[in-house]
Amino acid sequence: MQYFHILRVYMINAHKHIVAMALLCAFAFGDVAAQETEPSPWSRFGMGLTIPTLSSPQLMMGGVSSPIIDGYVINPDQPASAANCVSTLFQSSIHLNRSNMSEGDSTESVNYGSPGGFNLVVKKPGGSSAVMMGVVPYSAKGYNVSRTVETDTLMGNYKESYTGSGGTAKSYLGFAHSYKSKKWMPAGKSDSVLVGNRAVSLGAQVSFLSGEVISTSRLNIEDVTYLDHRSSSSMRHRSLSGLFGIQAFQLLWANYDSDRSFKGSATLYLGATYSPKAKLFTDSERTIETVQFLSNVETVIDTASYTNQLDAQGLMPSKYSIGGAIVFENANGRRLLLAADFMEEDWTVVSESSSEINILEGDATWAVASRTSLGLTLNPRTDRSNNNVLSRSTFKSGFALDLYPIAYKGNQLHGWRASAGVSVPLEGSRSTSKVHFGFEMGQRGVGVENGTVFEESLEESLFSIQFGVTLAPFFKNLWLTPKLYD
């Protein structure tokens, strides 16, 4: 009877996981279908504004990614991290966003949702190798801006409007392997303990970028005796690229008492990633039409111009990141991690290359993108005097300075973000599954050398709430482990 009771509990927990995954996928795929997840007018240029491919655990730390070794979450931007996962994991998230845009005396607020990535790591418990795969959003357009111009000319007043939609996503497949060493550490005066003191993990990913972005501009003249104008462009992008990563940790010191009980330690983490340049292929269509807008119905009168180009070649820039972290652990379970990370991506090579098509469009120019991140995590003490769910949670916070890959009027789009959140173990589940709750706030705009913002230029205040989940199998499910009867 006890066996059937345990089996029943396990099946209930399994069904809970399946329901949670189904709901998460339903919400996220609904947003993916729309692809309009970036209402910022800055998304007009290029492929749209890039979306961090990081999952909630990394975003809550300001985007720190390359050095973080955490066996209970997936880090899609660091291929080597998969080798350090404790078991097979599935991870995804959704994001609820609010953007407050201001330009001069005009203000506008937009609420929208966006999906996170779908990530999977397949690993045998206790193994040294792992396979990771997933789909993550890369860029998005979703802007809709307009202005009405009043003139004393014969043509009269007219309205200009600009809209964009679509986006790109990246699917990836990777492999990672870790090399570990152990060392005897003294425990008291006459004993010792064998501990892992050093490890190096190597990983590689191959990824495929694809998607379509659409931009449309309209000139609508109020006087119906004049015809109106519409210009639209569609670009379908695809690119095959690679990403390589390395992670290492070194035990700085560890203390054990004469009973061989752990007292405390400090560990250094280091990590780096590199993605080489890759070819970008684009199918482009551009149409310029004369239209007439009557009773909210737009009728095409004439096609003034139509051009299309297949397999136009360009470049995706190289990208690298490097970072480090130090971890302090205590016998009562308290754990503190302090980390820093830097990422750079040189988009100027796109304009300098012999590209057959201008994917940027507009008055902007390419620039060198970068992200500087600082983050920390804290695990409270977990001794018997304080064993509630919060004591077993991980609290995170971070700060990031962003430089975007576009410059306008000679000044680069930049911003800052502050974030915080908590990863909570999934109650009632006999696994290492976690639920992630986080928020992020920041600002984005075009500045000058002294840090001020152009007069009459667009400035955005951003706020985001994140909900994510990392699902792991029941701890007694030895997946990928041969059984006696195999």
What does each model-found stretch correspond to?
Residues 35-486:
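Subset of outer-membrane beta-barrel
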Residues 20-28:
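Bacterial N-terminal signal peptides
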Residues 29-34:
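Sec/Tat signal peptide C-region and signal peptidase I cleavage site
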Residues 3-19:
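Bacterial N-terminal signal peptides that target proteins for export
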